[in-house]
Amino acid sequence: MRVLVPPAERSQDTRVGAPAWREAAQAMARTAHILTDRCGQEAVTMWQPKDSVLDPNVAHHLGRAAYIQPWRFRVEMIKGGGTLEKPPPGEGVTLWKGKMKPPAWYARLPLPLHRKARALQTTEVVHAHARGARLTAARLGRAQHQINGRVRQLLRQREVTDHRLSEVRKGLLINQQSVKLRGYRPKSEKVPDKADSMLTWEKEELKSMKRKMERDMEKSEVLLKTLASCRDTLNFCFKERLQAVDLMNQPLDKVLEQARRHSWVNLSRAPTPRTQGQKTPPPDPVGTYNPACALALNEAKRLLVESKDTLVEMAKNEVDVREQQLQISDRVCASLAQKASETLELKERLNMTLGLMRGTILRCTKYNQELYTTHGLIKGPLSKVHLETAEKLDRPLVRMYQRHVGTQLPEAARLAQGTDKLQCHITYLEKNLDELLATHKNLSWGLNCKNIGHEVDGNVVRLRLRQRQPHVCYEQAQRLVKDWDPRTPPPRSKSSADP
């Protein structure tokens, strides 16, 4: 049975030990308890994230509920009145059964796998550097490929422009030959006309087109040299990037596709609908995308835009020059053909006039001969022995009548007057006949000049139409400009001179 001690007796200290000794033991226990709580709290705090430390002024269950609230799934309304639960965005482990997604946990102390984690991190950095180097090399290779394509396009356009320039130069040679051929016309046909003005105008226009084509050739040559220099720079950077990594068994185009890229121009451009492109990293002197690569790619982009504009301009100028040259040639040929038709019309008129004058000359010549015959008949024979009795001026009848005073007959005077009058008319007729012959000669010379002029203009038109054909090259047209008369055959070669 339990014995109850009275209060007076309970207050009495029955312990044997000294109070100081007991206080020292209790102080040591309290110190150990405080140290145990502090070390345990610090150990737990070291393993917890920084944001997981709860406020000591808030109840533990309330603080924990507020802490894990962002981890819970979010309920969203969908069309039709239903709901859809989605995990919160960000990194972490999705717990579908508990409908929570805790964030990634980062320890503040090294874990037991710290060495392996650091090795994996180093490997990841090295692989990232290799991927970046391969991506930069792929971009450089793609840029070099596009620069090569643009160089080929520029070379083809230069061939077209050079062909057009040779056509313009051939047009200048044809113009020079046309002027030279027209210089062989007679002096009367060299009166300045619209055909000469058209030839002069054609020469000036062809010179202007020649200067335009030469400027395009010079500009394209400078651009071609710049593109070649940029290509060499891209090739050097490309090989330099490939020296930093070990090549994998995949083409560099696959590297761009793995990076979700379909172009090397700019990683910050608007992505395609299928992929989300990565942004171009800033140039890093010690990284994979160094300033030299950035400068080479920027120069390549600038040259691609500039060369595209230059190609469009050169193609447009070539088309304009071709059409303009054809129109000018057609207008000059039309003016020369019109001049030839006008010359033919004048030649026909001169030919008709010459025919009429030839008939008049024949009639005048015949009439002059008849007048000479009449003049001879009036004057009579040269010898008296040939005179008939009825024609003698001293025949018996006349002598018998003229014996009387004042009976002189006017027969001799009348014959002399008629002879003189007939002689004057013959002289006047011969003068007119000389004028007719001189005019006939001038008309014949003019008709011959018109024939030569018509033939020369026709030859010039045929020459121009024949030489402007595409199969006639510049060298063939250059052989036409020689210092020889086209009306004379060219000298034969020594091999064909002697059989």
UniProtKB/Swiss-Prot annotation:
Coiled-coil intervals, chain numbering: 197-227, 297-317
Modified residues (Phosphotyrosine): 372
Ligase recorded as keyword: no
Major localization listed first in the record, in broad terms: cytoplasm
Keyword rRNA-binding annotated: no
GO CC terms, sorted: axonemal B tubule inner sheath; extracellular exosome; sperm flagellum
Keywords from the named record: Cell projection, Cilium, Coiled coil, Cytoplasm, Cytoskeleton, Flagellum, Phosphoprotein
Compartment list: Cytoplasm, Cytoskeleton, Flagellum axoneme
Matches recorded under InterPro entries: Tektin-like, TEKTL1
GO BP field: flagellated sperm motility
Function statement: Microtubule inner protein (MIP) part of the dynein-decorated doublet microtubules (DMTs) in sperm flagellar axoneme, which is required for motile flagellum beating. Forms an extensive interaction network cross-linking the lumen of axonemal doublet microtubules.
Complex and partners: Microtubule inner protein component of sperm flagellar doublet microtubules.
Name this protein carries in UniProt: Tektin-like protein 1
